[in-house]
C-alpha cells in the first residue's frame, strides 16, 4: 500500500513526563517529511531511551491504554494483548518493539504512543497499544489487572496506510485478533511473521467481501476470515464469522452461550447430511470474539491455554471439525441427528429404494438359484410360437428368446424366414387320382402316370410302350390287372448253400444262378457233397492243358445237371437260355 507524506504516525507523550519529551525522550517527535519504516522507527525509539528509567537502564516503552485520551465512540474498543517474552526478544534485546530488556523498569505509566492515522482522520478511533510491563516491572503491584483494556474496534476502520509495510507494528486486523485471542498467553508472535503467513492461508479471504457492512461505510478488513456464501458465519457474524457490527448493530448477532467458544453450531440440514462450511476458522480462541447487540464491542476472552493456534490449525477435509481442547461447555456436536427414515430424492432414485424403505424390517427376498429355474422349466409346458407344437425332440429359441420347435427353429435358421404354418397337402397316389384317365387305353389305375408328346396323361404301360417303340400301344394289349414283377426276399442260408454252384467259371451266368433252382434240382445227399464237387471241378480245370477241350465230366454230379453235356461255350449258352430261370436272369 502506498504511503503518503502524512500517512505515518506521530509519536506523542502524555502524562507527567510530557515536559521532557525533547530529544532525550524514547520516542522523539519527527516530522512526517519522509515515510519511515517501522523497523527503523522502533529501533531508534528503543535505543535512545537509556536515561529515562529510574535505574538508568535502557528500556522500550510500549503504549499504555489511556481511556480518557481516546475520543472514539462509547463502547467501541478492541482487545490487544501485550508482547510477551519470546526468543526473538531475547536475541534482539531492546530492539524488539514492546519488549523490555533485563533489569529495566518503567518510571512512569502515563506514557503512551498515539498512532494518528492521517488517512483515517475522519474516524475518532485510535490504535492504542497496551503496556507489557505489568508483569516484569517492579511496579507491577501498582498496575491493576484491568490494564488489558480494549482498543477501538478495527472493524470500523479500513486498512491503515502503513498496513502493508514490511515490519510494521500491525499488518492486518487478523494479527490484532490473534493477539487479542492470546491476551494472557506468554507467547510472542512477531507481527512481521504473522503478516507473511496470513496470505498463504486458504481460509482467510481478501478484503471487501465480508458478509456484514460496518456503520462507518468502510469495507471489511482484509485480515478477517470471510464466511462462505452457503453457510452462516460461525460466531453469529462476529470476528470469526467475517465482520463486526458498528454502533448501530447492523450486523450484530447474539453471542453463543459459551464465552470461550462463541461460535454456534450450524443449523441442521433437511436430510441430516454433513455440510462443509467455508468460513469456519478451526482454532479455539483464534477468532474468540463475539458481537454484542448494541455496543458492538469485542469481548475480552481467550484463556492462557488457548494460545495462538489459528495459524497452525488446518482445516479438515471430511466436513467435520475436531478440536484439541476438551472443555467445551455448550458446544453441540457438528453432525447433528442421524439419518432420518425419509430418504432424500436423488438422481438414482428407483422403485427398489422405495420398496426397501417401506420394508425396513422385512427381510430381503432370497434370489432363486438355477435349480429353481430348471424345475420351473420342467414343470411348465412349452409351446412353439410358430406352429403351436408342444412336443419336439429339441427346443430352440429365436432371436427374441421365444421357444421354437425343432422343425421351425431349423427352418428359420436355414432360410432366415419363419416356417410356413400351412402345411402342403399330401400327394394323393397316382393310381387313385380322381378324374385322371389314360389318353390311350382310358384306364384309371396305374402305378405311374406319364405324359405323352402332346402333354396328355397316359398310364405307365402306354407311356413306356410309346417310349420304346415310338407308336401308341395297341388296345388289344390292355389288361384288366396290372402285371407287377414279383420280388421275393433272398434267403441268406440258401444263398450260402448254393455258393458252390456259383463258383463255376465256365458259364457267363454262373454268378447269377438262382438259389431257388438249386433247391429244386438238388437232393439232400447231393447238398452235403457240394463242397467236394467244387474242389473236383477246380482240379479238372487245372489238369486240362488244352483250352479247346472243354469236356468236363462231373463225377457224382448227374443229379445236379441231369442230361447236361457241355462240349463248347456255344452249347452252354444255348442250354442255359432254354431253362425257365434264364429269362429272369438275363432280363
UniProtKB/Swiss-Prot annotation:
Keywords per UniProt: Activator, DNA-binding, Isopeptide bond, Metal-binding, Nucleus, Phosphoprotein, Repeat, Transcription, Transcription regulation, Ubl conjugation, Zinc, Zinc-finger
Bias (Gly residues): 234-251
SMART domains documented for this protein: ZnF_GATA
Molecular function terms from GO: chromatin binding; cis-regulatory region sequence-specific DNA binding; DNA binding; DNA-binding transcription factor activity; DNA-binding transcription factor activity, RNA polymerase II-specific; DNA-binding transcription factor binding; double-stranded DNA binding; NFAT protein binding
Residues modified as Phosphoserine: 266
Zinc finger (GATA-type): 384-408, 438-462
GO biological process assignments: animal organ formation; cardiac muscle cell differentiation; cardiac muscle cell proliferation; cardiac muscle hypertrophy in response to stress; cardiac muscle tissue development; cardiac vascular smooth muscle cell differentiation; cell fate commitment; cellular response to BMP stimulus
Biased amino acid composition, Basic residues: 484-493
Domain remark from Swiss-Prot or TrEMBL: The GATA-type zinc fingers mediate interaction with LMCD1.
Function: Transcriptional activator that regulates SEMA3C and PLXNA2. May regulate genes that protect epithelial cells from bacterial infection. Involved in gene regulation specifically in the gastric epithelium. Involved in bone morphogenetic protein (BMP)-mediated cardiac-specific gene expression. Binds to BMP response element (BMPRE) DNA sequences within cardiac activating regions.
Name this protein carries in UniProt: Transcription factor GATA-6
Organism: Rattus norvegicus (Rat)
Amino acid at each position: 500500500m502506498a504511503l503518503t507524506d502524512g500517512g505515518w504516525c506521530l509519536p506523542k507523550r502524555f502524562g507527567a513526563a510530557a515536559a521532557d519529551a525533547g530529544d532525550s525522550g524514547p520516542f522523539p517527535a519527527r516530522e512526517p517529511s519522509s515515510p519511515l519504516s517501522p523497523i527503523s522507527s522502533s529501533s531508534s525509539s528503543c535505543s535512545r531511551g537509556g536515561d529515562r528509567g529510574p535505574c538508568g537502564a535502557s528500556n522500550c516503552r510500549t503504549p499504555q491504554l489511556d481511556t480518557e485520551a481516546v475520543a472514539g465512540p462509547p463502547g467501541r474498543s478492541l482487545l490487544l494483548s501485550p508482547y510477551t517474552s519470546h526468543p526473538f526478544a531475547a536475541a534482539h534485546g531492546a530492539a524488539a518493539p514492546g519488549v523490555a530488556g533485563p533489569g529495566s523498569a518503567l518510571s512512569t505509566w502515563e506514557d503512551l504512543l498515539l498512532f494518528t492515522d492521517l488517512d483515517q482522520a475522519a474516524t475518532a478511533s485510535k490504535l492504542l497499544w497496551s503496556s507489557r510491563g505489568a508483569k516484569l516491572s517492579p511496579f507491577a503491584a501498582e498496575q491493576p489487572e484491568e490494564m488489558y483494556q480494549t482498543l477501538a474496534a478495527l472493524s470500523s476502520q479500513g486498512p491503515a496506510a502503513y498496513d502493508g509495510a514490511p515490519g510494521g507494528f500491525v499488518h492486518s486486523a487478523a494479527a490484532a485478533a490473534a493477539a487479542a485471542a492470546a491476551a494472557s498467553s506468554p507467547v510472542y508472535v512477531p507481527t512481521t511473521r504473522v503478516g507473511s503467513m496470513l496470505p498463504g492461508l486458504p481460509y482467510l479471504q481478501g478484503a471487501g467481501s465480508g458478509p456484514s457492512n460496518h456503520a462507518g461505510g468502510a469495507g471489511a478488513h482484509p485480515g478477517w476470515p470471510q464466511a462462505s456464501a452457503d453457510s452462516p458465519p460461525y460466531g453469529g457474524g462476529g470476528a470469526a464469522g467475517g465482520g463486526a457490527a458498528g454502533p448501530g448493530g447492523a450486523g450484530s448477532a447474539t453471542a453463543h452461550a459459551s464465552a470461550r467458544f462463541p461460535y454456534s453450531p450450524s443449523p441442521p440440514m433437511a436430510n441430516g447430511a454433513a455440510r462443509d462450511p467455508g468460513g469456519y476458522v478451526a482454532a479455539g480462541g483464534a477468532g474468540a470474539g463475539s458481537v454484542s447487540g448494541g455496543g458492538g464491542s469485542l469481548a475480552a476472552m481467550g484463556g492462557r491455554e488457548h494460545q495462538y493456534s489459528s495459524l497452525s490449525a488446518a482445516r479438515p477435509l471430511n466436513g467435520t471439525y475436531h478440536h484439541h481442547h476438551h472443555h467445551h461447555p455448550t458446544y453441540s456436536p457438528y453432525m447433528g441427528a442421524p439419518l432420518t427414515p425419509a430418504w432424500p430424492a436423488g438422481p438414482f432414485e428407483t422403485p427398489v429404494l422405495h420398496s426397501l424403505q417401506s420394508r425396513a424390517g422385512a427381510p430381503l427376498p432370497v434370489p432363486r438359484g438355477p435349480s429353481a429355474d430348471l424345475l420351473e422349466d420342467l414343470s411348465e409346458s412349452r409351446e412353439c410360437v410358430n406352429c403351436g407344437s408342444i412336443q419336439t425332440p429339441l427346443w430352440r429359441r429365436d432371436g427374441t428368446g421365444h421357444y421354437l420347435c425343432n422343425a421351425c427353429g431349423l427352418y428359420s435358421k436355414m432360410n432366415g424366414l419363419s416356417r410356413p404354418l400351412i402345411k402342403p397337402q399330401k400327394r394323393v397316389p397316382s393310381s387313385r387320382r380322381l378324374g385322371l384317365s389314360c389318353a390311350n387305353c382310358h384306364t384309371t389305375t396305374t402305378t405311374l402316370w406319364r405324359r405323352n408328346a402332346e402333354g396328355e396323361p397316359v398310364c405307365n404301360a402306354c407311356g413306356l410302350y410309346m417310349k420304346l417303340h415310338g407308336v401308341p400301344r395297341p388296345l388289344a394289349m390292355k389288361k384288366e390287372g396290372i402285371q407287377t414283377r414279383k420280388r421275393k426276399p433272398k434267403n441268406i442260408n440258401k444263398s450260402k448253400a448254393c455258393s458252390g454252384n456259383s463258383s463255376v467259371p465256365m458259364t457267363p451266368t454262373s454268378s447269377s444262378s438262382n438259389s431257388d433252382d438249386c433247391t429244386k434240382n438238388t437232393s439232400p445227399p447231393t447238398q452235403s457233397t457240394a463242397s467236394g464237387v467244387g474242389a473236383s471241378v477246380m482240379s479238372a480245370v487245372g489238369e486240362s492243358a488244352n483250352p479247346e477241350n472243354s469236356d468236363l465230366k462231373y463225377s457224382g454230379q448227374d443229379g445236379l445237371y441231369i442230361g447236361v453235356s457241355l462240349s463248347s461255350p456255344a452249347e452252354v449258352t444255348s442250354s442255359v437260355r432254354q431253362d425257365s430261370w434264364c429269362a429272369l436272369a438275363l432280363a
